[in-house]
Amino acid sequence: MSVWNYVVTAHKPTNVTHSCVGNFTGPQELNLIIAKCTRIEIHLLTPQGLQCICLQPMLDVPIYGRIATLELFRPHGETQDLLFIATERYKFCVLQWDTEASEVITRAMGDVSDRIGRPTDNGQIGIIDPDCRLIGLHLYDGLFKVIPFDNKGQLKEAFNIRLEELQVLDIKFLYGCPKPTIVVLYQDNKDARHVKTYEVSLKDKDFIEGPWAQNNLDNGASLLIPVPPPLCGVLIIGEETIVYCSASAFKAIPIRPSITRAYGRVDADGSRYLLGDHNGLLHLLVITHEKEKVTGLKIELLGETSIASTISYLDNAFVFIGSSYGDSQLVKLNLQPDTKGSYVEVLERYVNLGPIVDFCVVDLERQGQGQVVTCSGAYKDGSLRIVRNGIGINEQASVELQGIKGMWSLRSATDDPYDTFLVVSFISETRVLAMNLEDELEETEIEGFNSQVQTLFCHDAVYNQLVQVTSNSVRLVSSTSRDLKNEWFAPVGYSVNVATANATQVLLATGGGHLVYLEIGDGVLNEVKYAKLDYDISCLDINPIGENPNYSNIAAVGMWTDISVRIYSLPDLNLITKEQLGGEIIPRSVLMCSFEGISYLLCALGDGHLLNFVLSMSTGELTDRKKVSLGTQPITLRTFSSKDTTHVFAASDRPTVIYSSNKKLLYSNVNLKEVSHMCPFNVAAFPDSLAIAKEGELTIGTIDEIQKLHIRSIPLGEHARRISHQEQTRTFALCSVKYTQSNADDPEMHFVRLLDDQTFEFISTYPLDQFEYGCSILSCSFSDDSNVYYCIGTAYVMPEENEPTKGRILVFIVEDGKLQLIAEKETKGAVYSLNAFNGKLLAAINQKIQLYKWASREDGGSRELQTECGHHGHILALYVQTRGDFIVVGDLMKSISLLIFKHEEGAIEERARDYNANWMSAVEILDDDIYLGAENNFNLFTVRKNSEGATDEERSRLEVVGEYHLGEFVNRFRHGSLVMRLPDSDVGQIPTVIFGTVNGVIGVIASLPHDQYLFLEKLQTNLRKVIKGVGGLSHEQWRSFYNEKKTVDAKNFLDGDLIESFLDLSRNRMEEISKAMSVPVEELMKRVEELTRLH
């Protein structure tokens, strides 16, 4: 059953909603504080060289609320700033930095909600009087809430003042007023905009008419900027004019039509401001003045940035641009323009996936691991983002080299901690590379090696020696003098095909199934044993994993013909174990290794499959056989160590790192395309590095310790709103909109675009009609037709209509990389959703669900969509999911309903519905009986089909079984997983749904077995007692389902972010929880670590 769900964040919010600058962590420290809706980040500005600064992260914490206000202020008597935060659910807190503990502590907290009152339409406003006499909040229409400070800087009890103006657009405190004074920008009932000022009388708890007012401003006036002393007054930013206003002055300048989204003050005296508009243009506004008298305004275009939601001027011409529609940026404003005339230089980009309007889960590499491709950003900052889980390689150096056949690292002395040489083998030669003094790879020589032939294997050996195996000999060379000391030759007429070695032993195989075992002494190579096997040998390994680090008692041998892997004893080469691998694919690489004290034999096949066995070191027995698919090409296996633990690198077309946790083997993708060979290369300049050979180049790099999400960005310059993938044609199709600034008649152009799924280039475009929007997209096939099609649902959005009255369904086929329109069908409304349904097409058109069949035309020619049946009864059917004959509909305001298609009657009927009023934003089917919904108050809920109900009335109700406040606006759910699903993992069998949100969150909802749910619920309850929310905010309240009508505790949903934070606790706190639950700490850690593998 999918009743018990675990909700966890795979990618944190990245949409920057607020930012401010001040001295928060110390009187002399300058901080940038960033809010990302439900998280705050504190950064320290540190100089980096003379010309640059760096943002050093100090803290990143969740807030149990959606941040509505973020302001720094400094009450009397404080040496550094405090941080005021107010949330959308009417909680506030004042935070202070605790230098000792490097964390924030709560100075004050409270609830400012009123029982009655209509929440403001234009969002909450929170402001602080510049002289720190009070905090002002506009939360409900017609009310202004005041929280006064006492003379010690402590907050006193809040009170409300009636505010006549109902449609408030902005409120700010004015500087330099003897009594606290606010300036209010509002709209009257004739849609004209005005500004008024009020003094706040703390004694009378009321307003007194202020010093001035200004009527009939620019109709687009939307932002107030209070100007500090000595000038004081306020700037009123409109769409076509900017006005400076004070009791004694009025100055205005016209500007090019634009909507200003954000501003940042440059100087303390307030004479210069940065303005960011809806097109991402950054302007500098200057107030010209003679002493305290304002003489005029000037505005200048500086250049382009991401579309700014916040602008924070840092220092020395460095500016932080926070964005909700694109990546946030650290920019520098230069005195001289660049070649394109821009004064803006982007120094750093901070990835933002928001808003994720749509996404699809694809397996582009076809190896059982989902990648999420999102439609991210908006307007000119629109992009596709490819998000995948994996291990990153940080490149340190690289050289171009073609045709590498093998690589080994060697030391110049047995006890040397670092490697010196990197031996690289090619088809007819061997080269030796080493690091020079400049830390670059350069070619060198080991004189005793044969460099005219391909090397099959080499290794460090005891007594400061090196061993090189080629097709005709084994050479033993001094690592200090580099001279040849001894050589063993292959028998005449035989050549060595495969070989392996360790510090004291060499094992090699020649044609005809001959196996030869040599031992290495000081300057001598002794042939100890020879055996003739019944088939040719494909791979060998004698990696010592027993007691002696230099000597192995057993050898692993992979065979041609009988497709087996065998264990032989050393030195006498007696067969101990033989394991048939089955199938026809030969083993290409075998490796004995030890993880967490367990010995394994890994055996890689030529088709990208990997078998692993537990290997008994005493008996040589192989048990517990498991098989996974890592790629499609042959794999070569090598061990390397990272953080003092053994890992295995499997090089192939899908390189993978194999490691062990809780005594289970785990597999992580490496974020590289094909890798043919890898070997550890631990040099002083780049400790713990790996040498990696891929197509045409050799790279030296270090490896990430942990796997995490890696994000690749494909900037589009337009806004992709819908996406679908078609595996058969290896393409994506998008519905996108391009905004043009120049052409005023038609500022938007809508397209269907086809992209190649490997290069992500546009390969074909179909323009939609004027006013026609792409609303839905689907890749599907129809009954008795083997082709695969893209279906696009559109709407004609006419300026004079409230709701579209017409649209189209377009059916395309991809031929030679081009979109060919095969059929189109007019509809009587917007096609909000398209689903493949029993070989037909199910469309949601305004309030109707309509089923189309794919039928031949009467003229017997091509095919067309023909109406089959439909179902009315929705306000707007926006989101539809299907399973078998069931149809689940998410309505604009009538929550979720369940329909069924009846084959006999050829009709669609309603089976059940949820009678709550939920304004839906996404739906998904978890299993036959449980449906998941997200709605516009940032909640998740699940409903259950009540098939067993005794009466019709009971059966017609979808019963709400789970409720949870996510705090995120979900745009889409999709089934899928971000991690490789493995047979031996506990979480491998847990079904997961991925979601994407406006703030750029990618999350996972996992349906748990009931016993696991109960265990984790108990852990969550105990964690709530130990982990206190920042600012005293309550976790329980935050996760309670909340809308205008009701607030109820979360049920049947668990907060995975809270549960996984168990792993970050100190040992003492872990023990506290362990005691409360009577479960050992190790067991708790193990169970929580398993959960982290869901994402």
Curated annotation (Swiss-Prot):
Pfam families: Beta-prop_RSE1_1st, Beta-prop_RSE1_2nd, CPSF_A. Transmembrane segments: none annotated. It comes from the Eukaryota. InterPro entries: Beta-prop_RSE1/DDB1/CPSF1_1st, Cleavage/polyA-sp_fac_asu_C, Quinoprotein_ADH-like_sf, RSE1/DDB1/CFT1/CPSF1, WD40/YVTN_repeat-like_dom_sf. Gene3D superfamilies: 1.10.150.910, YVTN repeat-like/Quinoprotein amine dehydrogenase (2.130.10.10). One of its GO terms (biological process) is red, far-red light phototransduction. It is found in: Nucleus. One of its GO terms (cellular component) is nucleus. Keywords: Nucleus, Phytochrome signaling pathway. GO terms for molecular function: nucleic acid binding. Pathway: Protein modification; protein ubiquitination. The keyword Nucleus applies. Belongs to the DDB1 family. Probable component of the CDD complex, which probably also contains DET1. Component of light signal transduction machinery. Involved in fruit pigmentation and fruit nutritional quality. Acts as a negative regulator of fruit pigmentation. Probably acts by participating in the CDD complex, a complex probably required to regulate the activity of ubiquitin conjugating enzymes. Repression of photomorphogenesis is probably mediated by ubiquitination and subsequent degradation of photomorphogenesis-promoting factors such as HY5. This is DNA damage-binding protein 1. The gene is DDB1.
